Regions:
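Ligand-binding pocket segment of bilobal, Venus flytrap-like solute-binding proteins
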Residues: 1-89, 93
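Solvent-exposed, acidic/flexible segments
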Residues: 5-8, 29-32, 103, 120, ...
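A broad detector of the eukaryotic-type serine/threonine protein kinase catalytic domain
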Residues: 20-21, 44, 112-114, 149
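Long, contiguous hydrophobic alpha-helical segments, chiefly transmembrane helices and signal peptides
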Residues: 28-29, 47, 112-115, 144
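An extracytoplasmic/periplasmic, membrane-proximal ligand-sensing/linker region
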Residues: 63-66, 90, 96, 118-184
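Charged, low-complexity, helix-prone segments enriched in Lys/Glu/Asp/Gln
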Residues: 47, 104-109, 165-174
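C-terminal lobe and pocket-closing loops
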Residues: 57-135
Length: 184
């Protein structure tokens, strides 16, 4: 893992607690790239990374089937990985699914564009309209395509719903998630 509090340690802890896995977390790798290199060297048996990163940096592994993708850390299956379950699908209890969904919600919000609180509604609407227009701009989309990055934008309204769902998570779900993540 890349350190306490990082997804590379959080997800395995949550899966150990709620899906019955027995991952041994090895801390101290400075980045997910270092974790992948450790796997390549045989220092560790697995690592957490994004599908996009795996496709861009380890294409040979995928082509040669040198790697097994065990689970997806998201709420829905990625279109290119229809046969790989999500963490929510393998959680053994409704409490486990709730804790994982809460944790995933925070990760999904991690890449949001935000404005300060109290911004007048008309400005929020204007910013959202400008953002939505950018998402339809041919030059912008061409740059995204050229970068090779996956791009799955969410509208301001979708992000607002995710924020509301995450912020209104029941206290017992928040506490269960915190307790599990803090456990040794």
């Amino acid at each position: 893992g890349t350190g306490a509090g990082s997804p590379s340690e959080g997800y395995p802890k949550l899966l150990n607690a709620f899906a019955g896995t027995k991952f041994k977390i090895i801390s101290g790798y400075p980045s997910s790239t270092a974790g992948m290199l450790a796997m390549e060297r045989g220092e560790v048996d697995g690592a957490l990374t994004s599908w996009n990163t795996l496709k861009r940096t380890k294409q040979q592994w995928l082509q040669n089937r040198d790697i097994n993708v065990l689970v997806q850390y998201g709420t829905e299956r990625h279109p290119e990985m229809r046969d790989i379950p999500t963490v929510l699908e393998i959680a053994g209890t409704s409490e486990g699914r709730a804790a994982l969904a809460f944790y995933i919600g925070g990760a999904q919000l991690g890449r949001s564009l935000v404005a300060p609180p109290g911004l007048p509604a008309e400005r929020v609407k204007m910013l959202r309209s400008a953002f939505d227009a950018m998402l339809k701009d041919r030059d912008f989309l061409a740059e995204i395509d050229k970068s090779g990055q996956e791009f799955y934008p969410a509208s301001g309204e979708q992000v607002q719903k995710l924020i509301a769902a995450t912020a209104s998570a029941p206290r017992n779900v928040v506490e269960l998630t915190e307790t599990t993540l803090r456990a040794k």
